[in-house]
Amino acid sequence: DLGGTTLDVASITGQLEQISKVKGFDRIGCSIVYDEISRYLESEKLNTSNAYIHHLVDNRHDKSALKVAEDKRDGVFDAVNSAVQKLQSKVIRAVTQVEERPHNVFLVGGGSYLIETAIRKHFETAKVIMVDNPQFALSLAIADTIYSE
């Protein structure tokens, strides 16, 4: 479960029957990406608003879509992708602390879309599932459990 400021990883045994290990990482979250990009933008005297950073992250695969001056585009593109790769590396290290060779990986949380490709590549033998509506999946599942009784 990758959120803004935290990553929670659980290892579940059997047929999703029992949690065997859980670990929370309070310094791994999407804020890593936003902070890295913000520092770069500030050093280049560019817009550091969250809305602008969100635009850059959303368009990180298409350099031409970045709303930035042509002479700054390459640097911004590289900074954005470097920040995302930093997050991906930290998440992979954290997950392997809990489970080195998972059979299934369920991606939950608003930051899941930033790590999905790297998780699929690193855990290539695992079945990687991006849950529907990952940002709200956990809260919706809790609500469903409470109100279905």
Question: Regions from the language model: what does each represent?
Answer:
Residues 1, 24, 132-133:
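Conserved acidic E/D residue at the C-terminus of a beta-strand in Rossmann-like folds
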Residues 1-16, 37:
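Gly/Thr-rich phosphate-binding beta-strand-loop-beta motif of the actin/hexokinase/Hsp70
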Residues 3, 27, 31:
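Aspartyl protease active-site motif detector
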Residues 11, 32-46, 50-149:
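Helical "lid/coupling" subdomains associated with nucleotide-phosphate turnover
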